[in-house]
Amino acid sequence: MAAIILAGSSLGLAWNAASGRGLGLSRNVFIKDGDDIIQAGEAKARLEKGALFLDARPEAFYRMAHIPGALSLPEDDFDRAYERHEPRLRSTLDAVVYCSGFGCEASHIVARKLKERGIPASILHEGWPAWEEAHYPIREGAEP
C-alpha cells in the first residue's frame, strides 16, 4: 500500500512540475511585508489607465519582448538604468514592476529600491509568464 501511495505521489509531483501549468507547492519566499502584489488582470487594467511598467529582467530579455510601454529597469544594472529613467520614474503616480515569474526575485528587489527612493511600485505576481499566459499584448525590440 505504501508503495502505491509513494508511486502516485511521485507521479503527481512529476506531472505538476512538467505540465507548465502546475500548482505552486510553496509560498513565494521573496514576498515581504509591505510588498504590493497584484495579479495580471489588475496589472492590465492599470496599464490601460497609464501606469508605468518596469521590466526588472536583464535587458536582453526586455529586447526579446516586454509589456508595451515598459521601461527596462534591470535589477542587475539598477543604478545605471535608474539614472537614465529617473525623471520619468519620479513623475509617475503608478508603477508596476515585473520579472521572470515565480522564482524571480528581481521585481521585488527593484520595487523595494524604488520605495527607498520614494517611488511606490506594485509587483506583478508571477511576472512575465502570467502576462503572456493571459494573452495580453507584448512588444518586441528595444523600444518601450
PLM features per residue range, with description:
Residues L52, P120, P137:
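Residue-level detector of anion-binding/catalytic polar loops
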Residues E48, L52, A56-R80, R88-R90, ...:
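Mid-length scaffold segments of soluble, non-membrane domains
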